Regions:
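P-loop NTPase motor core of the ASCE superfamily
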Residues: 100, 516-570, 717-837
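Short, cationic low-complexity segments
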Residues: 132-161, 353, 445-450, 798-823
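P-loop NTPase motor domains
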Residues: 47, 51-63, 355-356, 366-422, ...
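Short glycine/proline-enriched loop/turn "hinge" motifs that connect secondary-structure elements
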Residues: 23-29, 102-107, 317-322, 414-416, ...
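Short secondary-structure boundary/capping segments
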Residues: 85-90, 127-132, 374-377, 484-489, ...
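Extended, folded cores of ATP/NTP-driven motor/assembly subunits in large transport
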Residues: 1-399
Length: 837
């Protein structure tokens, strides 16, 4: 038989009456305005920023009228990451990543703020007057409408003050968020079920003398309700030793040990009771006089008088507001052994704050009941202590989890605390918000810091989101990824250019799929031919440039009109030798050999014509139009020191990207230059690098340079002037080996002390149970954080630059007829199984 008496009892005890105009109204005619609070991300806040947040809270609270209650409630709920395994559109590596992170545990953090207007009598009530101890609650009527209006005006002012700060944002909660809808439970539902689930079901609540139980969960309550429980000094923040060095500081809020650092289900309640400060101080004056008159009878009276006098002296000399405060940690578990461990963990966390942990079993029921959103006025007065606003605010939590970027585009990184995946947009959203003015990136990381893993991880996700990616490499770092894409697209994409004696690198600058040659394409062909003809220190006259341009235009007209002529360097050379030279001789206005020596041009270019030593270079018969290819790798390690080949290869690369940049409207394009930039950034290419970095942003593009040597940055004016100054996104990896040189790096990159501290914390406190490397990402000097590059085994085998591992993958692929995806899948399974043994 259904027991209806319990339901009736719960209904009769329920302290809230209704939601009116967005405010919660209690049966005692008290109104509460509820907010969601957004805090800054963990490990990204400096001491000065903690001070600024503290100051903002203080200013906001000062505008509230007497007999107001500030109740901040932080929820920390253990959850598991749910991978998007049912998404049919995921690539092989994206699905592997989702599977790797699936069910990764983390602590979900949500912050709520409740501002309640009560009265003097109710604020002074003790636990025996709680609504739990009364009979049926008869709703009272709000009688003083003027007080309500003044309170609501103060709340508006409070909201404006907080939202004027850069670090904190508060948003009023709607009725649906508080009481829920048919589809989703509200905050009140979740409080009575102690869960953050979408639609929580109400649980039976047992409020016993020795135990509070909500459903299957047993509650454990630790309180800070007496000055004897508090530390001798408090501050807005404290040094987090695990991520600090002798040259840098990592700061966390004073209350962080009972926040995200406490890895269990818990709610951290922070109460401030704003009373009539002058009346409080008058009462303390009276108490001090009484204690003084009784001091001769008891030393404790004398000590109490000294404490009261000190409190009064500070209040009057510094103009501080006397308030009451209370803080508690409400943790729970359905398992008794786990609850015992949680009890110890909470006690240890409070001890880290130099507080004396007090496990409260006497008032647990009334404190749980007072924690109901909108029911702070039911708080038992004897559980609070007198203090001032400033020290009380030091017990407010001031940081939260890493947040996903509110953008459809981005890359997946991992939270450095729990390893939960974080969706991070470092290109579009920062541009839209004005944080950066270009999408260019500068990446600096020593060998072995995880640089190649990060860049592989980034470009793979850019490619999968529709970007055109062109990579210039010198160490086969992208061979695995390129081969995987080539195989997956059946050769339509994933083009890998490299030089070997058996298969030398070759191009065809005259080939296009559609016979379309715009001005930039024609100019790039002319630049290529001039580079082949003249050395870097030779002067090019206007006549020479003009005649060569005319020859190129005439040849292009020929191949567009007569498709039987194969577009390539050989046919161009023949046209120049057999047709254009004769046309020049027939002209009325002769061009002398001193103005344009076509014979010298033909002689110089002959080595690239069939039969010449470089006849392979510009006569590729593969007919690849790079404009349509979305993933291209130029591996130039073998040619970067060849004075004849390298300038040609460089121009081909640049022409390919500029062609994409100008012709692909509305499509993202990226050029990433690894260590090859040192060769490309030579004197004759300096102007191109400057041009690229300054103009690429106008074409929805981004240029990225990767380097590992600090000295390269400091010594190269091109890097300093063109690359660094035009890269609003800076990405740095482990810099511990350069700690003594870091001041030079900091000055060169224009890093703040905050950014320096973050960078020097990289890999200082890595979880030994997870395989990852950390990376610092800074955006325009305004936003920065350290993230983890954590990948699945499949991604690891694709990205690895370790020779033995690459050979293992390629050998397995060869055994499978070139199927690199199956090879990676098989090896990943084998390696995971070996780890389990």
């Amino acid at each position: 038989m259904r027991n209806k008496s319990k339901i009736t009892t719960l209904e009769s005890k329920f302290p809230l009456l209704s939601i009116e105009q967005g405010c919660m109204v209690s049966k005692d005619a008290e109104i509460t305005v509820a907010f969601r609070v957004e805090l800054p991300e963990l490990f990204t806040v400096t001491s000065a920023e903690y001070e600024a947040m503290h100051s903002a809270w203080h200013k906001a609270i000062k505008v509230l009228p007497n007999y107001s209650i500030v109740h901040k409630q932080d929820w920390f709920i253990k959850e598991d990451y749910q991978g998007k395994l049912s998404d049919g559109g995921l690539s092989f590596l994206a699905r592997s990543s989702e599977r790797h992170f699936n069910e990764r545990p983390y602590l979900h953090h949500a912050v709520y703020l409740f501002l309640t207007k009560t009265n003097k009598q109710h604020m002074a009530q003790q636990s025996n007057f709680s609504s739990l101890c009364r009979g049926h609650l008869l709703p009272k009527e709000i009688t003083n409408k003027d007080e309500v209006m003044k309170f609501m005006e103060a709340v508006d002012q409070f909201e404006r003050i907080i939202n004027d700060t850069e670090q904190i944002r508060i948003v009023r909660m709607t009725e649906d968020e508080l009481v829920g809808t048919n589809e989703k439970g509200g905050l009140l539902d979740r409080y009575f079920s102690l869960s953050e689930e979408g639609h929580a079901s109400l649980e039976d609540i047992r409020l016993g003398a020795d135990l509070v139980r909500v459903g299957d969960n047993m509650l454990c309550l630790h309180t800070l309700s007496d000055t004897d429980d508090l530390p001798t000094t408090v501050s807005t923040d404290s040094r987090y030793e695990r991520l600090s060095t002798d040259r840098s500081d990592c700061r966390l809020s004073f209350a962080s040990p009972v926040g995200l650092m406490l890895p269990c289900n818990h709610i951290y309640n922070q109460y401030l009771f704003i009373e009539d400060s002058d009346a409080n101080l008058e009462r303390f004056e009276k108490q001090a006089r009484n204690m003084h008159s009784l001091a001769r009878y008891s030393r404790s009276n004398q000590i109490n008088e000294e404490w009261i006098q000190e409190y009064l002296n500070i209040a009057h000399s510094q103009g501080l507001t006397s308030i009451r405060a209370h803080f508690n940690v409400l943790a729970w578990s359905s398992d008794k052994e786990e609850l015992r461990q949680i009890k110890n963990d909470v006690g240890s966390a409070l001890a880290l704050m130099e507080c004396h942990p007090r496990h409260n079993t006497i008032d647990a029921a009334t404190l749980y009941w007072a924690g109901i959103p909108g029911n702070a006025a039911d708080f038992p007065a004897e559980e609070s202590f007198y203090t001032f606003i400033e020290p009380a605010l030091c017990f407010f939590t001031a940081e939260t989890n890493y947040k996903d970027s509110l953008s459809p585009f981005g890359i997946k990184m991992a939270d450095r605390l729990s390893g939960k995946p974080v969706h991070l947009d470092i290109s579009d959203l920062p541009m839209k918000k004005g944080v950066i003015t270009n999408r260019n990136k500068f990446i600096l990381g020593p060998s072995g810091s995880g640089k190649s893993f990060f860049t592989n991880h980034m470009v793979r996700q850019y490619y999968e989101q529709g970007a055109h990616v062109l990579l210039v490499d010198t160490g086969n770092s992208y061979q695995g990824l390129c081969e995987l894409i080539h195989r997956k697209t059946k050769g339509k994409d994933g083009v890998y250019f490299t030089y070997t004696n058996e298969s030398p690198i070759s191009f065809n600058p005259f080939y296009t799929d559609d016979y379309f040659f715009d001005v930039e394409k024609r100019e790039s062909i002319c630049t290529l031919l001039l580079t082949l003809w003249k050395s870097a220190d030779e002067h090019i006259t206007k006549t020479e440039a003009g005649e060569l341009g005319s020859a190129v235009n005439s040849y292009i007209e020929l191949i567009c009109a007569d498709h039987s002529v194969t577009p390539c360097f050989n046919t161009f050379y023949e046209y120049l030798r057999d047709v254009y030279r004769k046309d020049m001789e027939k002209r009325d206005i002769k061009v002398t050999l001193s103005d344009f020596n076509i014979n010298n041009l033909l002689t110089t270019l002959k080595q690239y014509y069939k039969g010449g030593r470089y006849d392979f270079l510009l006569n590729s018969d593969k007919n690849i139009d790079l404009l349509s290819k979305r993933f291209i790798v130029f591996e130039i390690d073998q040619v970067k020191d060849n004075k004849d080949l390298f300038p040609v290869v460089t121009i081909i690369i640049m022409e390919a990207f500029i062609n994409k940049m100008r012709r692909l409207k509305g499509i993202r394009k990226m050029i990433l230059i690894e260590e090859a930039w040192k060769a490309i950034a030579s004197a004759n290419m300096a102007d191109y690098i400057k041009y690229l970095y300054k103009t690429v942003r106008k074409y929805f593009g981004e240029a990225i340079v990767v380097t590992q040597e600090v000295d390269d940055i400091i010594q190269s004016p091109i890097v300093k002037e063109s690359i660094i100054n035009n890269s609003d996104c800076k990405i740095l990896l482990d810099k511990r080996k350069y700690m003594t040189k870091f001041d030079g790096i900091q000055a060169m990159l224009g890093l703040s002390e905050k950014e320096k501290s973050q960078i020097l914390s990289i890999n200082q406190n890595n979880d030994p149970n997870r395989l990852y490397k950390e990376v610092w990402i800074g955006l325009g000097g305004m936003q920065s954080a350290v993230y983890a590059t954590e990948v699945s085994m499949e991604e690891y085998l694709t990205y690895t630059t370790e020779e033995t591992e690459k050979v293992e993958v390629m050998n397995r692929a060869a055994q499978l007829g070139g199927d690199i995806e199956t090879a990676i899948r098989q090896l990943a399974i084998e390696k995971r199984n070996n780890k389990k043994k």
